């Protein structure tokens, strides 16, 4: 017998997981400087390449470390290092050409002062990734010469994320900062808060949050926390629903223009990617039989992946952080920096709950004019609306921290947390991918023949009854015109076999 085929266009979820990569190294201070104490350490991570091969997924990226330190005289300075890394995860289902999407986040960051004055660090990077395949799936559509073959199908709604526009824009802004002479370290984070169609174009708006440790001409430390709004008009193709935008900052710089101007110059490239959702409905064959030909179905199990759109939410909190035992009291709290990490994400009843930690670093000055720093972990829980069909999400977390007060053994810190989410759903389906001839696939109830009165099971339809007894489903309907499908448990059906 010759099998007839149909190719389904469906996005399949191959694998999703979170991999942890350890990155370690040391960063020497700039020439002429020797660190006596490390005050702060911040890190940014970027995945530059993510590609599938047969049986494996390869990651390549870089970790950028910024260290703020003090020498033996108490003078402060900063230095930067970049460490490349690579990682490979193996899976027998991976194949070349599959689609992959990876989001990295620094989960753990430790630093210590090495004997040679360099800053030794170790970091754990979490890589949240999804691997999908858009290759057509071959399914059964019939058997040549078997006219009475019946195929049962289910309608499957698909929603595929498509990129409808991308653009890189150079963004520049001058910020006022009284007394700032130099920038020791800073972080810049971008959050897209709205994407809208306006006047035939796409308007994207949001905020860039800057957190900087600055130094005055007198050697004093000061903190700058600033939100810089942006609004850009971009081009995007039509024909997609529920558009949203993902943005990344690259080639970022922040520099002081001199104490006489009291200004900081911020520059960055913003990579915008606009996504939309294109929906369709496909028929997936789930079962088949023929009254005249004995065969059994062969199935291919797959997980259909659908995009559910994106959303944005904000969360604020205030915490009192205590100075560890053995350290001097706070005379002046100088700087707070926070790095967020999600420890648990769940979606239930159209609500996403995110639990996590804000890894916080505090720098302060004691009454003896010495600079100290300490770490603390602040837990958080936030909830935000999620699409009803969503099963999981990929998150981008941005956090800013600022000193709102501090003295004695306590520093008061205010946090702002931005959450950008891309939602997805997954559903398992078994499709008929072939048949194999058998001798008894259509034998039923001990090969009963004649007039039969059978009991239906709950949820069965004429196809199920027809397959069980080897008769056309249309005959089942004709003999039982008053029985509605799907049948109820115990419904009595008349058959001629």
Language model region names:
Residues 1-448:
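Membrane-lipid interaction segments
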Residues 439-478, 483-497:
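Primarily a LysM-type cell-wall glycan-binding module
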């Amino acid at each position: 017998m010759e099998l007839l085929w149909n190719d389904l266009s469906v996005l399949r979820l191959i694998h999703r997981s979170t991999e942890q990569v350890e990155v370690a190294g040391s960063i020497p201070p700039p020439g002429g400087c020797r660190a006596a104490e490390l005050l702060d350490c911040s890190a940014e991570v970027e995945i530059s390449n993510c590609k599938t091969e047969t049986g494996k997924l390869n990651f390549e990226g870089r970790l950028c470390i910024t260290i703020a330190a003090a020498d033996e005289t108490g003078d402060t300075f900063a230095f930067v290092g970049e460490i490349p890394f690579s990682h490979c995860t193996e899976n027998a289902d991976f194949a070349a050409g599959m689609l992959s999407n990876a989001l990295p986040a620094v989960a753990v960051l430790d630093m210590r002062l090495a004997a040679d004055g360099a800053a030794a660090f170790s970091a754990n990077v979490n890589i949240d990734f999804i691997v999908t395949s858009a290759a057509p799936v071959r399914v059964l559509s019939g058997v040549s010469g078997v006219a009475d073959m019946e195929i049962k199908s289910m309608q499957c709604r698909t929603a595929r994320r498509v990129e409808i526009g991308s653009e890189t824009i150079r963004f520049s802004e001058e910020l006022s900062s009284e007394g700032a002479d130099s920038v020791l370290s800073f972080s810049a984070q971008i959050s897209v808060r709205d994407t809208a169609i306006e006047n035939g174009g796409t308007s994207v708006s949001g905020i860039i949050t800057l957190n900087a440790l600055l130094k005055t001409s007198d050697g004093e430390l000061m903190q700058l926390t600033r939100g810089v709004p942006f609004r850009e008009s971009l081009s995007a193709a039509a024909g997609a629903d529920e558009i949203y935008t993902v943005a990344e900052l690259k080639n970022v710089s922040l520099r002081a223009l001199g104490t006489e101007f009291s200004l900081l110059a911020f520059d960055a490239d913003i990579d915008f990617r606009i996504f939309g959702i294109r929906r369709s409905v496909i028929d997936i064959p789930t079962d088949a039989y023929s009254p005249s030909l004995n065969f059994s179905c062969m199935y291919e199990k797959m997980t259909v992946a659908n995009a559910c759109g994106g959303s944005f939410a904000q969360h604020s909190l205030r915490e009192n952080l205590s100075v560890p035992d053995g350290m001097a009291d706070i005379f002046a709290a100088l700087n707070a920096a926070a790095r967020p990490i999600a420890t648990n994400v769940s979606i239930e009843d159209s609500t996403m709950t995110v639990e996590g930690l804000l890894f916080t670093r505090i720098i302060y000055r004691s009454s003896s004019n010495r600079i100290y720093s300490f770490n603390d972990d602040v837990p958080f829980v936030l909830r935000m609306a999620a699409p009803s069909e969503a099963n999981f999400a990929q998150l981008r977390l941005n956090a800013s921290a600022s000193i709102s007060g501090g003295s004695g053994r306590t520093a008061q810190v205010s946090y702002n947390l931005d959450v950008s989410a891309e939602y997805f759903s997954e559903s398992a389906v078994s499709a008929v991918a072939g048949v194999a001839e058998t001798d008894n696939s259509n034998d039923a109830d001990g090969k009963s023949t004649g007039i039969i009165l059978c009991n239906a099971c709950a949820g069965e339809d004429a196809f199920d009854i027809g397959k069980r007894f080897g008769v056309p489903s249309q005959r089942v309907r004709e003999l039982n015109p008053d029985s509605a499908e799907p049948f109820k448990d115990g419904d009595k059906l008349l058959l001629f076999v």
